[in-house]
Amino acid sequence: MLKTIRKHGITLALFAAGSTGLTAAINQMTKTTIAEQASLQQKALFDQVLPAERYNNALAQSCYLVTAPELGKGEHRVYIAKQDDKPVAAVLEATAPDGYSGAIQLLVGADFNGTVLGTRVTEHHETPGLGDKIELRLSDWITHFAGKKISGADDAHWAVKKDGGNFDQFTGATITPRAVVNAVKRAGLYAQTLPEQLSQLPACGE
């Protein structure tokens, strides 16, 4: 009887150990898969705001943290694109704080000479059917920033048409596009200051 109990006890212990090991392995595989998927999604988003042929470094690994009013409150990530180890452009996280329904989060690609290379909205709470046209799936409006140059802080072209600029507003919704245009302009101007700052910026994860 005692031998039987011991035998069952050992069997249960081995089963428990095996189950624990299997669970740990599955969890690790799941974490790896999620991380890989997130990395692919991030790369796809980068490619929408910065043409892949413009750089040849691992963009996600060239990440810096900045605290700059031009990008909005708090810390924002900035990714430096390099061609043969020379900084040539950046992808910047930016916040438009003055959307109709709150802050609008953006990703802006820009070179260091004042040209915006692409822009995408990553998060917003704008009104469906009105301000949400800043989303690429609903309108191509957000693509109209690509290739546009900013000629200084006083460049009047960088405004919605209602304010005398070059960018369309939406029917019944001017606040949202105005907020995005202004935020992209600020980010593009800030990008021009990055080369001289790089040696002083903390890397992401430090």
Swiss-Prot record:
SMART domains: FMN_bind. The chain crosses the membrane at residues 9-29. Keywords: Cell inner membrane, Cell membrane, Electron transport, Flavoprotein, FMN, Membrane, Phosphoprotein, Translocase, Transmembrane, Transmembrane helix, Transport. The modification FMN phosphoryl threonine is found at residue 174. GO terms for molecular function: electron transfer activity; FMN binding. Its EC number is 7.-.-.-. GO terms for cellular component: plasma membrane. The keyword Chaperone does not apply. It comes from the Bacteria. Its main location: membrane. It is a single-pass membrane protein. The complex is composed of six subunits: RsxA, RsxB, RsxC, RsxD, RsxE and RsxG. PANTHER family: ION-TRANSLOCATING OXIDOREDUCTASE COMPLEX SUBUNIT G. This is Ion-translocating oxidoreductase complex subunit G. It comes from Escherichia coli O157:H7. The gene is rsxG.
